[in-house]
């Protein structure tokens, strides 16, 4: 298996999806497609938008490429936390491989996208168009029944950089970007192959791909800096915000006892990460202030409390000094 991800042009992806469906009734190998309303999953609101199901993939390699997002959608996912981007990207960001271990509990030693930020942006736009197509053409659900939630890191300087700012603004309004125009044109050209998708459906696809953002900060990031970045994303960018918090908030003693009681005595970690990470006593009032700020701005704010938990690599499980339980 290659350790590099290769982006496929939108027209190729479009032909692949339509051709595979025509020939075998599957999408990227998925034959049992989920239709909204099937089963026990119920719709849910999310930060001003509508979710046909309250499930979907968290930011990871599974939300880096357009085809992975499509596969998640046809299997029932409707909430997509897009792979995190940061100022260091592409060839400048080395990720040791393999970077994921899931024999029992899941671990990883990777972080932000392995693509360039521009490539990541283009993958998300490709996926956005393909999901709108599949929703209508295969009658899988509403064209506004899924949500893309962008994810950025890891410090204020990087997030304010021209590269990341362009990414954020592009997902807020992609209408003037080259990839948007390319996808729109290709989809219009493919309409003769479609039974249900119309020109009006294509033109109705919203260029406001993301109205929400997830903030990921490094382990050890001070509370004041976290609050400053969160405030910037709400005040300056006008985005609904999710803040990632780490399980180290629980404290060393609680985490050690909980894992031991559950039989995970082989998981090894030290106290130092608990001491340098955001502390519970600082997190609670900070979250309260951010909730108040969001309300004053007419925005939504939430926290993700199960981000990454650093543990020691003792048996060569992954090619790094530490790995993160996810």
Describe every region a protein language model picked out.
Residues 321-325:
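A membrane-topology feature that recognizes alpha-helical transmembrane segments
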Residues 2-9, 16-34, 38-39, 59-61, ...:
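Active-site entrance/lid segments in N-terminal catalytic domains of soluble metabolic enzymes
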Residues 33-56:
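N-terminal amphipathic alpha-helix/helix-capping segment at the start of soluble metabolic enzymes
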């Amino acid at each position: 298996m290659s350790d590099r991800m290769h982006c496929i042009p939108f027209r190729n992806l479009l032909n692949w999806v339509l051709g595979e469906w025509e020939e075998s009734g599957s999408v990227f190998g998925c034959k049992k497609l989920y239709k909204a309303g099937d089963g026990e999953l119920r719709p849910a609101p999310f930060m001003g938008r509508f979710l046909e199901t309250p499930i979907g993939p968290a930011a990871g390699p599974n939300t880096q490429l357009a085809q992975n997002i499509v596969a998640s959608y046809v299997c029932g996912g409707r909430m997509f936390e897009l792979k995190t981007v940061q100022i260091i990207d592409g060839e400048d960001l080395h990720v040791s491989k393999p970077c994921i271990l899931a024999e029992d509990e899941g671990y990883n030693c990777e972080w932000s996208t392995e693509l360039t930020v521009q490539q990541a942006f283009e993958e998300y736009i490709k996926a956005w168009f393909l999901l709108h197509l599949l929703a209508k053409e295969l009658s899988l659900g509403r064209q506004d029944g899924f949500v893309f939630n962008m994810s950025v890191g890891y410090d204020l300087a990087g997030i304010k950089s021209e590269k990341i700012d362009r990414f954020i603004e592009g997902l807020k309004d992609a209408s003037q970007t080259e990839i948007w125009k390319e996808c729109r044109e290709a989809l219009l050209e493919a309409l003769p192959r479609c039974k249900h998708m119309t020109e009006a459906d294509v033109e109705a696809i919203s260029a406001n791909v993301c109205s929400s953002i997830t903030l990921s900060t490094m382990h050890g990031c001070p509370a004041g800096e976290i609050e400053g970045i969160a405030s910037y994303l709400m005040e300056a960018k006008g985005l609904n915000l999710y803040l990632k918090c780490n399980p180290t908030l629980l404290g060393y003693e609680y985490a050690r006892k909980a894992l031991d009681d559950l039989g995970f005595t082989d998981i090894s970690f030290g106290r130092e990460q608990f001491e340098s990470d955001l502390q519970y006593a600082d997190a609670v009032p900070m979250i309260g202030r951010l909730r108040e700020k969001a309300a004053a701005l007419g925005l939504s704010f939430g926290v993700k409390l199960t981000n990454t938990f650093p543990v020691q690599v003792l048996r060569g499980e992954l090619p790094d000094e530490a790995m993160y339980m996810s």
